[in-house]
């Protein structure tokens, strides 16, 4: 519901970019939500310019993380029950098919700052200050994890908790422009390259 057009002024989004459905010039309308989609019958603007990696897909808790099904999809079911399978995962989190089934301009909001980020910032900061997670840090990260359906305990040692926080940033903010900043802030250069290589093993040194 977070990204539904009708619910765009929700309390989760602290600050966001509000697009207009009435502007038709160039890229002024909110088309970011469908430019990520694969080609679908009846969706005129789907381009599939940026798809998710297999590494991202596999990193989710496939059984329990409720964010997976609303964020990424490997197939699409049409209203007549027919199914289209994809050869890779695509980002569906922004598309409100009820508000604009053909993928034209909508009144969607692109979130810049969300409440979930504030919880994770608290968790990250407390772990750095204390060189390990105290009770407040665990409560903060669990505010995000529990909402997503995750109830398993997170490690409280410094490195283990830091990895858990980075993982939550990754899953909570898919295609919201966070990943690069999270990796450069929380990882050493060696860790950064290792993570990128795992995500895109076909990439060249120049692309890094």
Language model: regions and residue ranges:
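Acidic/polar-rich alpha-helix caps and helix-coil junctions
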Residues: 1-27, 62-208
């Amino acid at each position: 519901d977070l990204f539904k057009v009708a619910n765009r002024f929700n309390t989760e989004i602290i600050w966001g970019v509000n697009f207009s459905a009435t502007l038709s010039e160039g890229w002024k309308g909110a088309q970011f939500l469908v430019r990520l989609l694969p080609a679908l019958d009846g969706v005129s603007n789907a381009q599939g310019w940026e798809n998710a990696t297999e590494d991202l897909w596999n990193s989710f808790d496939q059984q329990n993380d409720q964010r997976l099904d609303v964020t990424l999809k490997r197939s699409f079911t049409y209203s007549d029950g027919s199914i289209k399978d994809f050869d890779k995962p695509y980002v569906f989190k922004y598309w409100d098919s009820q508000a604009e089934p053909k993928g034209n301009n909508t009144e969607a909001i692109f979130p810049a700052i969300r409440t979930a980020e504030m919880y994770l910032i608290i968790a990250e900061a407390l772990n750095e200050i204390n060189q390990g997670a105290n009770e407040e840090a665990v409560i903060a990260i669990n505010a995000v994890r529990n909402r997503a359906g995750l109830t398993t305990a997170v490690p409280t040692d410094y490195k283990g908790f830091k990895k858990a926080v980075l993982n939550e940033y990754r899953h909570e903010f898919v295609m919201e422009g966070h990943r690069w900043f999270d990796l450069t802030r929380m990882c050493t250069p060696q860790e950064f390259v290792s993570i990128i290589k795992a995500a895109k093993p076909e990439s060249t040194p120049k692309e890094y």
